Structure formats: C-alpha cells, structure tokens
Amino acid sequence: MPYSLQPQPEGFADVPGFPLCMYMVRGSTWTLVPPDL
C-alpha cells in the first residue's frame, strides 16, 4: 500500500497531497476519491 493507513471498507484519511480525501479499499488497492464539495 502506498500509504500507511489502517485498512477499512471506506473512510477519510489525511494523506499528503490528498487532505481529507475519501478512500476506498478494493482488494489490496487504495482508491482515493476527492471529497464532494
């Protein structure tokens, strides 16, 4: 995984370059999704 985050079905993560973006874990792949503004 590119980031050291705790695996969860979905949630929010403070990732450098992706502040407070929604992330979804599919299999072993992290998918960062921009928050709906």
UniProtKB/Swiss-Prot annotation:
Principal subcellular localisation of the protein: secreted
Subcellular locations according to the entry: Secreted
Propeptide residues, chain positions: 1-7, 18-37
UniProt-recorded Gene Ontology molecular function terms: hormone activity
Cystine pairs: none
GO cellular component, one term: extracellular region
Tissues showing expression: Preoptic area and testis.
Top-level taxon of origin: Eukaryota
Keywords: Hormone, Secreted
Family assignment from sequence similarity: Belongs to the GnRH family.
Function text: Precursor for a gonadotropin regulatory hormone (GNRH) related decapeptide.
Protein name in the entry: Putative preoptic regulatory factor 1
Record gene name: Porf1
